[in-house]
Amino acid sequence: MGGFGGALKNISIGIASTHGNTNIHTAGVTTEAAELFNNLPPQDHFLESMADACKAVISYKGAENMLYINVANRLSVDCDCDSHPAEPEMSDLGIFASVDPVAVDQACYDAVVNSPDPGKKALIERMDSRHGIHTVEAAAQHGLGNREYEIISLDE
């Protein structure tokens, strides 16, 4: 698991075919799903592979043609691919949108960390134990966006 499921995870893992997903999860070792669990790479290699896939998608579609929307509700420690995910422990944080996938994911990560919600503890532990922010770091290094952002609230 990537440790953090936002825009970057969804434009890499979410768009990829079964063979593409296997290629991402194994950091390029294989595209054969039957070989996936025998070829799991170090965690950071997997996260960097997600950033590589993001770069490919954005390059193909054109950054000017993309908008990223993260709906931060019912936040669970488990991936949405888990057939039996843990119940959410954290309240909703809102909807985040940007033309910058790095900024929107960094903003969501920071919103979790800075939330007063006591339910954040388990989510932060999961993100940190999986080095979830590394996909954001790698995507920024690829030039896919900026980790600095400004929150503009539409509620106020």
Regions found by a protein language model. Give the residues of each.
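Extended, low-polarity segments enriched in aliphatic/aromatic residues
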Residues: 1-156
